[in-house]
Amino acid sequence: MLTTTSAQQCPFMSGGEEEGAAATRASAGDGAQEQAARPERGGPTLSFGGATPYVDYAGIDTLLDLQRTRTDEPAESAFLITTQVMELLFVLVRERWEAARDALEADDVPAALAGLRGACRAQDVLNDSWGLLGDMTPTQFNRFRASFGEASGFQSYGYRKLEFLLGNKSAAMIRPHKAMEPVVDELTRLLEAPSLYDAALRLLHRRGLPVPADHVERDWTRAYEPDPGVERAWAEVYADDRPGNDLYLLAEALMDVAERVTRWRHLHLVAVKRTMGGKPGSGGSNGLNWLARHVEQDVFPELWSLRNTI
C-alpha cells in the first residue's frame, strides 16, 4: 500500500515534528531552500525569505484585510464576507458567460457548452452562499443595518455586468457608477455588445432556423424583448432531441443557466423577506416588491414559454 506523510496528503496541513525539525536544521545553517525542502523525502518547503508564495500569489494579506466591519454585531461579519464572496463569484460567472457568448459567435458550440457548464458550477456555489445568512435574525440585522447607509446590492457593478450579459439592459443602470470611469467603460462595452442569448439566436439563424431578422441584428443596447418567431425557432430545435443535436444541447444548457439565475433571485428575495420584511430597501427601492418583480422576469424567455406548447 502506498503511504504519504500528512503534509503530502494536504498542502494546508502541518508536516509534523519531522518537518519542523528539518526547518530548525535549515535555519541553523545557511537557510538554503534546498535544505528545508528535503526533496529526497518529498517533504514541503518550510523556509522562505518573506511571505510564503501562497500568500503572495493569492494576495491573502490583502484579501483578509477587507473584512472591516463597522459595528460589534457578529452577524455583520457573515453579511460582509458573504457579500464579498458573491462579488468574486460574479467575476467567475461573467468570465464564463462571456467565453460562451464568444464561442457561439465563432460557431464553436462545444466550447460554448463547456463555458456554460463551468458557469453553472460557479452559479451553484453562488446560490449556496445565501445559506451563510440563513440564520441571521431581524434583530441582528437591525444592529448593523444603519452602518452601511445607502449601500445596496442594486449598486453592484459586478452583478450589473451579469444582467447585461443576460440581455436585461438599460443605459440608466450605468449612471450610479459615473464617477468610476473604468467601470463605466466596461459596462458600456457589455451594453453595446450582443448578450449571451443574442449570440445563441444568431447561431440559430446561421444554421437556417427562422429567427426573426430584428432579433439577429438590432440595437444591442436595448433590453431583450421576447418574440413568437424566436419561440418557433426553438420549437424546431426541440423537435430533434437526439444527443447529437448540438443546438438542443445548447438550449438545455441555457436553461440550466436560466434556472440558476431564477433560483438566485428567489433566494435573494427570501433572505430579504426573512431579515427585514417589507421595509424600504437601503438603496431607495421598495425592497421586497422590487425583488419580487425581478424574480418573475424570465431569463431567455422563449425557452420558458416554449414549454407551454411542447
Predicted regions and their residues:
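Surface-exposed peri-terminal alpha-helical interaction modules
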Residues: 2-310
